[in-house]
């Protein structure tokens, strides 16, 4: 039986709280770079009565994201996206943080946007660290908003020599 589908990236507690609140009656497909994380959280959700499929999904890879979405579509129309995936400054170098948190989020939104059902919704959870840094200029905001996804990581402002440390990349 086809159901409405929620896709959920990043098998953590914040994503689970959203999925528990919003995903009852839906097929929930949870993806995480570490399949064991997706499997563990899927078991917790299943024990609470949710229909959950765990998958390995690497947010830094367009191919992996497309595979995740294609698999989810086998269960029905994607009606909801929960993006709670990401890496923190203590977990990875600057390049990885940008590849996952910026590029990966842009790819996920772009690819889901192509297939989400009419009336579908999505939420992306981000960090409060943005409030610790200086505000971006209007020009920087425009570059991040309007640069094609595949060109984002080539922006001069995102080159490692222009990013002070991992906290600033975050």
Predicted feature locations:
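Rossmann-fold cofactor-recognition segment
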Residues: 45-63
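Rossmann-fold scaffold of SDR-type NAD(P)-dependent oxidoreductases
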Residues: 7-9, 77-86, 120-127
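Catalytic loop of short-chain dehydrogenase/reductase
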Residues: 89-91, 114, 118-170
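Conserved glycine-rich Rossmann-like NAD(P)H-binding loop of the short-chain dehydrogenase/reductase
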Residues: 24-40
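Hydrophobic positions on the long internal alpha-helix
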Residues: 68, 82, 108-112, 116
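Canonical Rossmann dinucleotide-binding motif of NAD(H)/NADP(H)-dependent dehydrogenases/reductases
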Residues: 1-29
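Conserved Rossmann-fold cofactor-binding substructure of NAD(P)-dependent oxidoreductases
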Residues: 60-76
């Amino acid at each position: 039986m086809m159901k409405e589908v929620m896709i959920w990236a990043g098998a953590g507690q914040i994503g689970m709280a959203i999925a528990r609140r919003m995903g009852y009656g839906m097929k929930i497909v949870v993806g995480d770079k570490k399949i064991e994380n997706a499997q563990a959280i899927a078991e917790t959700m299943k024990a609470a009565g949710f229909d959950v499929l765990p998958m390995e999904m690497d947010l830094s890879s367009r191919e992996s994201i497309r595979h995740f979405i294609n698999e989810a579509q086998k269960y029905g129309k994607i009606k909801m996206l929960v993006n709670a995936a990401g890496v923190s400054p203590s977990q990875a170098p600057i390049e990885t943080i940008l590849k996952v948190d910026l590029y990966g989020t842009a790819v996920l939104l772009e690819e889901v946007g192509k297939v989400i059902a009419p009336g579908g919704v999505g939420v992306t959870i981000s960090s409060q660290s943005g409030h610790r840094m200086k505000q971006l200029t209007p020009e920087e905001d425009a570059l991040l908003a309007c640069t094609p996804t595949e060109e984002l990581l080539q922006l001069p402002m995102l080159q490692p020599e222009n990013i002070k440390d991992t906290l600033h990349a975050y």
